[in-house]
Amino acid sequence: MKFAVLVFPGSNCDADLYHAIVDVCHEEAAYVSYTATSLAGFDAVLIPGGFSYDDYLRSGAIAKLAPIMTAVVAFAKAGKPVLGICNGFQILTEAGLLPGALLPNRQTHFICETVTLQVENNDTRFTNQYAKGATIALPIAHGEGNYYCDPETLAQLHANHQIAFTYTTDVNGSLDNIAGITNEAGNVLGMMPHPERAVEVLLGSADGLGVFQSILTTLKSGVVTHGE
């Protein structure tokens, strides 16, 4: 399986994602520039964290206009897996691939710590290697991770089981403690915590490895989940 790791000006977690796929999961990955226009030959797309375009205007607001994003939208609409982490989540909401928005943290400052999450739905391409209701520890590092959407959208997220992860405590003001959501089809996931920083026990936790193992399990089995 081959993963595309996107790189925007200001991305700073792309190497961590590459390491998680190549060195830990022993799969193939390649960096793909924001100037590229094709994702041919890739099985999954990973959009890393960082500060794309220095978060100018709004986190992800300029990145959504990069040439590669046209290909990402087409890739997602074709039902292929797309994972956006931290700034990647922000980019996905700006691009309209996920509902809602990421607002400044309620505390109005950057938060960098390890938090506890609960797996709300394990019937997705990204969570099938976790038990439903399991708690996992993942790092966060963001200033704008406060998930918000209108009441109708929030009701739809719950009704469609699109909430993949929640924080077990109120970390940043996110509605219903939402930490990660999928699109309605289930092939796009955005999450603020960093699973790629928790794939080796040596570094404190391997709880994030399940996200990548879940993607691989689905790709290799050819079985899709969550409404596909």
Swiss-Prot record:
* The protein, known as: Phosphoribosylformylglycinamidine synthase subunit PurQ
Note whether Cytoplasm occurs among the keywords: yes
Pathway annotation from the record? Purine metabolism; IMP biosynthesis via de novo pathway; 5-amino-1-(5-phospho-D-ribosyl)imidazole from N(2)-formyl-N(1)-(5-phospho-D-ribosyl)glycinamide: step 1/2
What GO biological process term is on the record, naming one? 'de novo' IMP biosynthetic process
EC code: 6.3.5.3, 3.5.1.2
Task: Show the catalytic activity.
Answer: N(2)-formyl-N(1)-(5-phospho-beta-D-ribosyl)glycinamide + L-glutamine + ATP + H2O = 2-formamido-N(1)-(5-O-phospho-beta-D-ribosyl)acetamidine + L-glutamate + ADP + phosphate + H(+); L-glutamine + H2O = L-glutamate + NH4(+)
* Gene Ontology CC, one term: cytoplasm
The record's active-site residues are 86, 194, 196
